[in-house]
Amino acid sequence: MPEAFFAVDGDSYVPGVLTQGPWGAAMGGQIVGGLLGWGIERSGIDPDLQPARLTVDLLRPVLLEPVQIQTAVQREGRRIKLVDGTLVQNGKTVARASALFLRRGDHPDGEVWSPPLRMPPLPADADDFGADAPFFIWGYGANPQKGARGMAEWEQSDSQKFAWTRLFRPMVQGHPLTPLVRLAFVGDITSSLTHWGSGGLRYINADYTVTASRLPDGEYLGLAAQSHYGTAGVATGAATLFDRHGPIGTSSALALAQPADAFRPTYL
């Protein structure tokens, strides 16, 4: 089994080297959100409840040091459950999440409008990743039929972007990956996908949200960029989420402008 992102030490979670993100000596947003999603799911969720929405607030840089997770139920009813999660480091809250769970039931008859969307095909060599890669991503840019590993197809392009992702490392040592953790992880990629333009990636996200009408089936999650709007250094981006069967929900990310040389990924 691949090395996990975190090891357990008492009530703390100790980050490995692969938790570092592309914005300096701090954890990546997908790592922070993935761990919060893992902690919320571990707090005790009825399997008949659908994880319908997860919002992650990235309050400050999370250092490459041990963290603790705190969870609290804010609302629990017959058809709804709202759980908050907090990431604490050195006694300070560094990130938080809010997860909304809705009870599944009979689905109404009839058709409802939704825009027609298609994802590029799944990559054929998705098992070809390096031992030092935190996750697999296959990006598509100006040519949606010709992708490449990593984000090379996004470089200096203002075209619509797509990505297929595969999380293959456990979030926490000794605990298998779950569909909810995959959703929590991939939501952060929305920021890069939607805010990357002709000048490269010039925005860092302060949050992200994922919504899902059902859990993803399989290891692969896809993202199709839908919009980017920005004014005076503030931007909002939105994407549609896919699994191998089709659309499952949406994602969004709010972001702030950054210097051109601030984004320094070490693994893509």
Annotate each PLM feature.
Residues 1-268:
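Terminal targeting signals and extreme-terminal segments of soluble enzymes
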